[in-house]
Amino acid sequence: MNKIYLILILFTFVGIILANVEKAEVSCTCDENCNDGNKCTLDKCNNGCCSNTPININDNDECTVDTCNPKTGISHTPVNCDDGNSCTADSCLCGKGCQHVPIACDDNNACTVDSCSNSTGCCHTPLSCDDNNPCTVDSCSNSTGCCHTPINVDDHNACTEDKCTQSGGVTHTPIACDDKNACTVDSCSNSTGCCHTPLSCDDNNACTVDSCSNSTGCVHTPINVDDHNACTEDKCTQSGGVTHTPIACDDKNACTADSCSNSTGCCHTPITCDDNNACTVDSCSNSTGCCHTPINVDDNNACTEDKCTQSGGVTHTPIACDDKNACTVDSCSNSTGCVHTPLACDDKNPCTVDSCSNSTGCCHTPINVDDNNACTEDKCTQSGGVTHTPINCDDNNKCTVDSCSNSTGCCHTPMSCDDNNPCTVDSCSNSTGCVHTPINVDDNNACTEDKCTQNGGVTHTPIACDDKNACTVDSCSNSTGCCHTPLKCDDNNACTVDSCSNSTGCVHTPINVDDNNACTEDKCTQSGGVTHTPISCDDKNPCTIDSCSNSTGCVHTPMSCDDRNPCTSDFCSWEKGCQHVALSCNDFNACTMDSCSNSTGCTHTPIACDDKNACTVDSCSNSTGCVHTPLTCDDNNPCTVDSCSNSTGCCHTPINVDDHNACTEDKCTQSGGVTHTPIACDDKNACTVDSCSNSTGCCHTPLSCDDNNACTVDSCSNSTGCVHTPINVDDNNACTEDKCTQNGGVTHTPIACDDKNACTVDSCSNSTGCCHTPLKCDDNNPCTVDSCSNSTGCVHTPMNVDDNNACTEDKCTQNGGVTHTPIRCDDLNSCTADSCSNSTGCVHTPINCDDNNKCTADSCSNSTGCCHTPISCDDNNPCTVDSCSNSTGCCHTPINVDDNNPCTEDKCTQSGGVTHTPIGCNDNNACTVDSCSNSTGCTHTPMKCDDNNPCTIDSCSNSTGCVHTPMNCDDGNFCTLDSCCSTGCTHTPIIIDDNNPCTVDSCCNSTGVVHTPVDCNDNNVLTCDYCSIKQGGKCIHVPMTQCKTFGKCGDDL
C-alpha cells in the first residue's frame, strides 16, 4: 500500500514539473496571475515571471500517508498498521510508527490452556485433568485448576492399613502390631491402633532377679548366693536372704583326718599308721583309728626267749637259767620258765629293792622310780609310793613352741611365722612372737597407687587426675600428686568476652555491637571500641523510592504508576519512568463478548453454549463458536457396562461378580474375567477356631480349653492359647504336704519329721515346719560323762578317773570327786623285787644281776649265779662306727659326713662312702636371684627391676621376672599432646590456631580442636555477608545486587 502512495506522489510531482515547463514563459504582474489551478503548488509572481513551486505536504507524523490532489489539495490519510496477525494489537505511535503488541489471551480460567493462532487469535482449550490414577477423583476449579482428590479409603479402624488398588478398589489390610519385643504383649485397638503392654515378669520368687530380654522375654536369674567358700552350703531363703551354713566334713572314719578347704571343700586325708616297727602289724580301724598289733613270737615255751628282729624275723633263744648265784636254785619249766628260789632279803624298806648278790649276799638296791618319761621328775615316798611330777619346759621364748617328749624331754620347736601372705616379711621376736612386716611398695611417686599383688609382686598404677573440669589442665607431679592448672582463655581479641565453662572449656563470646538500628553497619574495632556507620540505600532504580527503616534496613518501595484507569496498561520504564499504554480488549475469541470499562477494565463475557444434553461435551471454539461434542463414556474398565443418559450423563454399571459364597472375595480382573478368592478368616486370636460358612462367612468358634484335669484352672490367652493354671492347694501349714487329687479335692498329709537322729526330739510347727530339738541327756550322775549318739541316743560314759598310774586304784566318789589309792604289789616271792610301774602296774623284777656294765649281757643261773656275757654291738650299718661304753652300752655313732658346706647335701652311701651333692636353691620365683653361700646356705635376693626409665612401671612377675609396662600417659584430654620424657608424663597443650582469621579456634577437652566459622550474618536479606581472610577476619556486608554469583560471597567479590 505504501508503494502505491509513493507512485502517486511521483506522478503528481512529474505533472507539476511538466505544467511549469509549459507555462514557463507566462508573464505576470501579481500572484493571482500565476494560479495554475493546481492545489499542490505554491503560485508566485517574481519579477513578472510566474513560479509554481510544489508545496511541502509532509506533516512529520509517521502515522499518516501524506498526498496531494491537484484538484482537492493536501490529505493526511492514517497509516493502516494491520499486520494481518490476529495475535497482535496493531496501533501507531507518534514518533515510532506502527506498533504490533502481542495480545494477552489469559481468560483467567485455570481450566483452559490459553494460546493464540495467527489466523484466528486467542484459543482457550479445555484442560485435561485426567491423572490416570483410579485412586483420585479428577475435577477442575476455574480458579485453581486441576484437582485430584484421593478417594476416601478410611474404614475408621486403626487396626487396618487402608489402600486404594491400581484397579480403583479399596483394601483394608490388618496391620502387624508385633514390635519384635518379647517384653510386651502386642494387641490392637480399633480406635487407637497398636498397643504394646509391658509384660509382667514378677515370678513372686524372692530368690530370683526378674528382668526381661527384648529377644527372649522374661528372665528369672537366680540371685548369686555363692560365697566362694566350698566349706559352706549356700542357700537363698523364702524372704530373699542368704545363708552360708558350714558343712559337716566328719566322715565318721577314725582312719581319715577330716578338714575343709575353702576352695575344694571337704578333705578326708588317710592318716599314716606306720610306726616304723617291723615287729608290729599296722592297721587302722574306722572306729578307733591306728592299731599297732605286736606280731606273735610266743612259742609257748617259757624256757626260750622269744624275740622279733629288726628285719621282722622271730628268734626263740633258749634262756640260761643258771644265775651263777648261790642265792638261788636255778631250774626251768616249759610252762613257767626259770625258777630261782630267792633268799629272803626283805629289809622292810619300801624304797629299796631287796636282792641277793651271788658274791656278797643280800643287796638292797634303791627301787627304780624311773617311769621312762623324760617329762617327769621321779621320786619314791616314805610310804613306798612313787611320784612323777611334770617338769616345766617353758624357755620364755615366744619364738618356740614348748613341749615335752617322753623320750627326750623338753622340746623347743622354732615357731613357723609364715602367714602365707607374700606381701609381708615374716620374722619372730623372742619377746612378742611372730612379726609380719608389710613389704615396702612405695615408689616415692605421688602419681601412682602402690600395691602388693597376691603373688608378691608390686604394682605402681598411675592415678587418674581428671577433675572433670574443662577449665583446668590436669597433670600429675611425681612429688605432690595431681595438679589442676587453671586454663588460660585469653584469645587476645578485644572484641570478645573471655570466660570458661566447667563442662566445655574456654568460651569467647563476641561483645554486642548491635545498636538495634538496621540502618547502620555495626563493628568492633581492634581496640575494643564500637562504630555505627550509616549504610547507603540507593539502588539506582528510578522505579523505586529508596528509604531506610531502623528495624528492617533498606526499603526499595516500587513506584506506583497506576493512573486509576483499568483500560490502560501502566508500567515503569528504567529510561522514561511511568508509562500508560492503551489496553486492547479484543481477544479475537468468537466465544466472548469483548469490551472495556473505565471502572472495571476489559471484559470478555463468555457466550452460553450449554445445550442441556448431559451426553455432549459443550465447548466453544475461539474461531467458530459453540461446539457440542458427543460424550465418550468408555471408562476403559472391562468390569463396568458403559452407557449415557441425556439427563445424568455417563453411567458405569459394575458387572455382577457375586458367586453367593460368603467365603470368597469376588473380583473382576483387569481383563474382564471374574475371580472368587477364598477369604482369610484368621482373627489372630489363639482362643478361637477359625472357619468359614458359605452362607454367613467367617466363624470364630471359642476354643475349648478343658484339659480334664480337676487340679488346674483352665483359661485362654489371646496370644498363646489355652492356659492351665494349677489350683492353689497351700493350707499355709508347714506341717502338711499339700496335693490336689484326681477328682479336684485337696489333701493335706502330715509330713514325717523323723530326722533319723536319736539325739533330737522331732516335732512340727505349723508356721516353720519340722523342729528337731536337741535331746537332754543329763543323768544327774557326777561320775558319768553325758553325751548323745546319733544312732542310739543318750550315752552315759563313766568318767575317766584313770590317772595313768597303774599303781593306784582309781575311783569316782558320790560327789563327783576322784580318789587314787595305791595298790599292794607283794607277790610273796623272795626272788623278785616287787615294785610298781605307773605305766604297767605291779612289777616283779628278777633280782638285779646288773654289773653296771652295759657291755655285758647279765643273767642269773640257778646254780652259778649272775652271768656277764659280752654283747655284740655290730648294727650291720657301714655308716656308723660301732663301739660299747660300760656306762651306756652300744654306741652307733654316725660317721661324720659334714663337709661344713651348707650348699651341699651330705650323705653316707650303703657301701660306706660319703657323697656331697650340691643342693638346688631354685625357689621357682623369677623375681629372685638364687645363690648359695658356703657360710649361710641358700639366699634368694629380690631382683632389681628398676630400668631407670621414668616412662615404664617396673614390677616383677613370679613366673616371668621383671616387667616394664609402658606408662599410660593419656590424660583423656583431647586438648593436650601426651608423651613421656625423662621427667615422666607430660601433657603439652596442642596448637589450635589454624591461621584462618575467619574461624574462632578453641579446644574441647572431650572432643578436641574446633574451628568455628566467624558468624558475619547481619540478619539483612539484602546483603551478602562473609568474613574476609584478606582483611584479617573482618566481616563484610555487600549489597546482594553486587554479588558476582548466586549464593556465593567471599574474597572473590
UniProtKB/Swiss-Prot annotation:
Keywords: Extracellular matrix, Repeat, Secreted, Signal. GO terms for biological process: culmination involved in sorocarp development; extracellular matrix organization; socially cooperative development. Induction: By the putative stalk-specific morphogen DIF (differentiation inducing factor). The keyword Repeat applies. GO terms for cellular component: extracellular matrix; extracellular region. It is found in: Secreted, Extracellular space, Extracellular matrix. InterPro entries: ECM-enzyme_regulator, S_mold_repeat. Its main location: secreted. B- repeats lie at residues 157-180, 229-252, 301-324, 373-396, 445-468, 517-540, 661-684, 733-756, 805-828, 901-924. GO terms for molecular function: structural molecule activity. A- repeats lie at residues 109-132, 133-156, 181-204, 205-228, 253-276, 277-300, 325-348, 349-372, 397-420, 421-444, 469-492, 493-516, 541-564, 589-612, 613-636, 637-660, 685-708, 709-732, 757-780, 781-804, 829-852, 853-876, 877-900, 925-948, 949-971, 972-995, 996-1019. Residues 1-18 form the signal peptide. Residues 38-1019 are annotated as: 41 X 24 AA tandem repeats, Cys-rich. The keyword S-adenosyl-L-methionine does not apply. X- repeats lie at residues 38-60, 61-84, 85-108, 565-588. It comes from the Eukaryota. Component of the stalk tube, the matrix that encases stalk cells. This is Prestalk protein. It comes from Dictyostelium discoideum (Social amoeba).
